[in-house]
Amino acid sequence: MAEKLQNLELSSEELDRFTKAFQDPKFREMFVQYAEEIRDPENRRKYEQEISQMESERGMDIKFIHPKPGYVLLTSVNGVQKCYLNICSNDLLQKPECKPGKDGEGKAGLHWSLPYSLSAGREDLGKDGSKHVIYDVVFHPDTLHIASKNEKFKMIVDSTSLEAVASQFDVKLDKANVRTLSMKYKGVPNPSVLRKPLLGTTPKHGDPEDPLSFPYPYDVPTAVGKEKKDQKRVIKEEHKQHVTTSEQDPDIQIATTPNYTVRHRSYVDLQDFRDSRDSTPSPVPKELVITVDLPLLNSAESVNLHIAGKNLSLESEKPAYKLNVKLPYVVEDNQGKAQFNKARRQLIITVPVIQHNILTLMQDHFEEARGEKDLRGAESSVLHEEYTDNGSRTSACGTENKLEPLISCLNEEENNSEGLTSESNLDTGAPYLPEISPNQNTLDREEVVYGLTEDVPSMPSDTLVCPTFSCSQDPTSLTLIAHVRDIDENSISTDVGSNHYHIRCSVKQSTSSYDLLVTFLPHDIINPNEVYVNISENNALIGLTKSPESVGFWKMLYFGVSGQPLQERRFVSEDNINEVLACSIPLSQVSPSTQEHQPLIEVLEMTDERTHIRINKPKTECVVSAEHKEHCTDHSEHERDVGVERSNIAVGDTTEHYSNQVSPCRENTELDRDHTSERYEEPESTSCTGESTSDQQQKDSNLVFPGDSSAENKMACLKSSEQTTQESDLAEDDMPDRSDHTQNFDSRPASSSVLKEIGKKDGSVQVISDHTTQCPFQFQNSLLFDLD
């Protein structure tokens, strides 16, 4: 009633007039008499006769249909409130008719025609104060008589009533939870009107200037209006033909999905509004409030509710309700609560949301990753590498590979001005990177990769191409961008698992097909339900969501074509960088003297597009013998003693004899590995204390060079040493830019590409000018390759 009064739109003056009128005793007496006249049946009969006479003057024949009680159907409308359908009867309606016919399967039967009349829905209040809607559906008495004798015919009458109300008043009725009540009629009976045009009569048009003439509230039926109604009826019949058999068959009881709402609830905390970086209010709510509308339910005793993680399921047999909801956040099901509101027939479920601390999850993930990394390192050291006594390594598969030092040599250059050849003896203490045989590599990849792709369906790989893609990640998601143009969206097929993602597609106006299989480590799990693919003109974007137990930065992935060996790809992270640096220079295989002279490598920045490192020169102390210790004094400069000698042989010569005498302030680091005859020498940078410049020059003049001991050679060597010392003492700010550095990099006299090998039997020296080595990892940046 309150809503109807609001629709009146009364002004304040009109309300005052009504208030004063009802305060007058005479007005109240007249109002009571008017109400009694309306309720009098005789007065209502006269009222109907007068209305019929006025309608006949307009060319319309009307009949008042007074419904006779039959039985009542209970259901719900729009999933919100109860709905009652009064199945009534009246003699003014046509009798039911039937015709023999066959159904779609060719079975013989009867086609029934059931005329009916509908009345508009009206709201009423129940005993508990809840609102419900009432509709009247009127048939001929013979229709209800047959329905009382035949149960199948009654089901036809019920389904006809439900479809008529739903289509005529554009409402949604719950057909799965229809129940027949024991009462015969619900509410107060209200008559309805049948209006038909009179044949052979001309309607009288009132004078528009007459103050007593009122516009006709109903449309006069015409031929055009009749055609439109026929068209609408045909459209409705065609729509009914597309309805599935399960929806038309009343015997099949399908559970109804109730209406529900999910609300996010949070609490205001003043600590979240401090002037601090960690005081940002969290976007994750504290609680989730799920409200489920169950209008046909009297209590929550027959409801089964189950909550696990992000899934919420609700089931009820009588009435038949079934609801499966995927919540936006993981909730604590043990601390939730549910309440049933009988007045509104609603089930209110409140569950707290698990508040994930991203930093804690990332730290736990990194600790687990380090533990697994140490375990894999211990296993790989036993399974993959076994060294023999003669300096060779035998892999787990039985293949034997010779040791090759990890050395990068520069091309040999001649000093034309001085006629001298600069050479650098290589240090045998340089670390060795053990090779992995091809068989062993395949075995490990089969164990790691193929084990992850057992559930992925195999596809023909002869015509498939792996696309070029880039990947990025954050603690909760991973994004892949496949750089393929003009992808046909209709050709995309995907397969998602807990540890893999597979996509195949083809290109428009081309026969080429692309196939990409991405697999992850067993502890890196993705959520198969939260995957999206966005296709554009230039590429395809694939978004993967990490599971809550795998939140953090992942270490690596494997990619390739399905059915073929996959390639390993590591993410750019601090752990991966440290692991690469640790693997490239294992300290356990380097002598203590060499460890002191190892360069200090500092990675400033490393991304997929750019790598920035800093290599610091170590500060070492001069180690000399006892007979020359007195010559080492304080020295203000950091010098690098480079051995320069005059050679009488060309670059292509294979042997060269030299003296074994060395400088007092020079240290030759030698490593005899596995009792072999190979020896590599490299002069190290030294820092002498307590020695003046003049003393240093005097000592350098006493050096003995192989092949020539003249003063000319001594002075040339001294000049070369001083020049090298000055170049090494340049400050970092005085160094030239990268372009100048790369141009003059190969022209430095202190570097040489000569590699010497001393024979074990005759002591001959073999000069190797062309030398290739093996690198533990590939540099994407050319500067890193040059520095190596």
Curated annotation (Swiss-Prot):
InterPro entries tied to this protein: Kintoun (IPR034727), PIH1/Kintoun_subfamily (IPR050734), PIH1_N (IPR012981), PIH1D1/2/3_CS-like (IPR041442)
Extent of Polar residues compositional bias: 417-427, 685-701, 744-754
Signal sequence coordinates: none
The entry's keywords: Cytoplasm
GO BP, sorted A to Z: axonemal dynein complex assembly; cilium-dependent cell motility; epithelial cilium movement involved in extracellular fluid movement
UniProt-annotated location(s): Cytoplasm; Dynein axonemal particle
Similarity annotation: Belongs to the PIH1 family. Kintoun subfamily.
Job of this protein: Required for cytoplasmic pre-assembly of axonemal dyneins, thereby playing a central role in motility in cilia and flagella. Involved in pre-assembly of dynein arm complexes in the cytoplasm before intraflagellar transport loads them for the ciliary compartment.
Protein name as annotated: Protein kintoun
Species whose genome carries this gene: Xenopus laevis (African clawed frog)
